Amino acid sequence: MRCCHICKLPGRVMGIRVLRLSLVVILVLLLVAGALTALLPSVKEDKMLMLRREIKSQGKSTMDSFTLIMQTYNRTDLLLKLLNHYQAVPNLHKVIVVWNNIGEKAPDELWNSLGPHPIPVIFKQQTANRMRNRLQVFPELETNAVLMVDDDTLISTPDLVFAFSVWQQFPDQIVGFVPRKHVSTSSGIYSYGSFEMQAPGSGNGDQYSMVLIGASFFNSKYLELFQRQPAAVHALIDDTQNCDDIAMNFIIAKHIGKTSGIFVKPVNMDNLEKETNSGYSGMWHRAEHALQRSYCINKLVNIYDSMPLRYSNIMISQFGFPYANYKRKI
């Protein structure tokens, strides 16, 4: 019995040696793998973010996302605040900033230094300060939907998410938050008017015939359609530095043969103009603003030889009110 017990010892010793050898081999392989990994080029955080963004965007159709276009002039502080706010909006694919500060470098380096950012922001330096610069066919535009926002307007994320869902149901119309109307007179001259929500019980509410593009969604195909308009339309906008939004309503109404836009009642939309340090005020403050826009309406009627704008009283709200029946001006 003692002899048999002694005979089993060499086998156990051999097993221990094999185990030790295996551990040594595994350790060497791990060290080699670590060394090879160290030799590989490092992947920066911003590159990884870009890669994840590309993979994410590839999984979405062009109807599931939109591009924000924002034209700006002399409001860098406010611009950075707005860009930071809109970064968190779901379904936002890209931001295009139309930089109208001629002779001044766009703040792309400053913006990038505050990153990384989940949504890419592209600054488009312009050679002339024109109102219609924002209506170019940008090669970076890859989505069907455009969200156009003025550089002093902050729209809440819930409002944008809801309005985008409405636009997906009506992709041939402007879907936005600021309605306006044209008013005809007995002399046949048109004037530009605001939109007043009326008190309940006073009818189905006021009517609008335009939805301003400075806080709206619309189809990117209309940017190309705008470029094909008569030269007189472009000249009117350049001469007045105004009315590109009125022209877009004319163009779309004429193209689709119905009301150009759908009014979505905003819950939380603010004008931040007073928060900028530049001291620059929007053109709507000018005394001649309303007269100039009335002039544009009549001029466009002459150019197109018709009045394509049509009235609507439909208001779509997150809270289910079907008509514009609240007494206040928008």
Swiss-Prot record:
Disulfide bonds: 243-296
Carbohydrate-modified residues: 74
Annotated membrane topology: Single-pass type II membrane protein
Tissue: Ubiquitous.
Cytoplasmic topological intervals: 1-22
Subcellular location per the Swiss-Prot or TrEMBL entry: Endoplasmic reticulum membrane
Function summary: Glycosyltransferase required for the biosynthesis of heparan-sulfate and responsible for the alternating addition of beta-1-4-linked glucuronic acid (GlcA) and alpha-1-4-linked N-acetylglucosamine (GlcNAc) units to nascent heparan sulfate chains.
Protein name: Exostosin-like 2
Encoding gene (name): EXTL2
